[in-house]
Amino acid sequence: MPAHALAPHQLRLIIDPASLGFATTAELQGQPLPWIGQERAQAAAQFGLNLQQPDYHLFVLGEVGSGRASLLRQAMHEAAAQRPVPPDLCYLHNFDHPERPRALRLPAGQGRQLRQGMGNVARNLQADIPKRLASPDFKAEAGRLQQQWQAQESAAFAQLDEFAKARQCNLTREGGQMVFTLTGARGQPLTEAEARALPPERRAEIDLAEQALRAEIGRFLDTMRPLERARDEALAALRRRTIKPLVEQGLDGLRQGLRKQIKDGAKLSQWLERVERALLEHIDLFEPLHDQEPDSDAEADRKDALDDLLARCQVNLVVDNDGRTAAPVVVEDHPTARTLFGSIEHGLDSDTVQSDHTGILAGSLLKAHGGFILLHLQDVAAEEGLWPRLRRFLRCGRLQIEEGAGGGGPAAHGPGAPAALLPEPVDVEVKIVLIGSVEEYYALQEADPDTARRFRAKVDFVE
């Protein structure tokens, strides 16, 4: 090819800025990255990401610097935009088996609505129940029931008192106990010296009278116990009738706010019924103890018990998809058992480790439900025990959050260890994008063919 001499001005390239289509390079932020020379990889990625079939996860082969991660993230976001927003995930207290919290899926945004609604119900009840129990109508009816029982008790005690007087005994009540003393001919209490001075025949009569009186006291107590229970049950029923409209009003308003069709609607209804029952069974916890000082131990115990009750009614929103417009795309750069599968936090109460449904935390797999998650094979393999657990997840498609996942929690054994929580497992639909080198891909094929076959979409970046 012949050589040609060029003039200096021919060595200078001049481009008109108006022809570029942008004012500054800042406008190029967010522009799609080109798949230069990677058309086959692009087609494979789009095929795998858009195919909604089980066991069609993606394995991305390519060397560092090939653009594999950036291009796959871009493709994942494009595919996610075509998918619906997945539901929220909540964990609820299990009233029958507290160690097994219930999982509840709700349409996106309604998990936050349920959590806030239950918080409002709790706050309103704490303010309204004491007011309702202090109302004139309630006090009048409670007083009537108390007077009815008091009349029965007074009549029965009057008979017992007459029985005691007929046997020359004086019957009194001291600190909830029945106390009787011998009386003389004029009804005055006998001193110990006077009692010892009585003739043997009289002392024998007194012994018989004392036995008869003790037996009569026993019959009196046997008669009063069921009457006391009936009074307490009547008062408890009155309290429930008085407070039930408040509880129903709060929970019905919450139900009406959740207008969308809920797949787990039956589960939610059952839980709300159990919440209502628990609140009505413990109405007394909402009312301060009138015979106790505000800082007394008994009042502190009541407040602690109320806090525990309301905690059981809390909603733990572990995955909140409110405000999303597409399926999630999660990039997990530090996969551990804790970050990938979730964990359970613990609290310390009176030197005892405690855990309940409010301590459940979601991992990346739960957050990616309905969408995509990107992992690097090298990172997963470097974490001890993580690959076998991921393999089990791929096999069954269900995720179980476990105690002590990834460390950081309390010891699983010992006197201060809590009863192990077993949150309800949940089905997770997620497309996994696993990035690795060519060597790692074929090593996986040889070492774990059963898992490798679940990555049927092979995205091969050419060098």
Identify the role of each PLM range.
Residues 1-463:
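Non-catalytic accessory segments flanking P-loop/AAA+ NTPase cores
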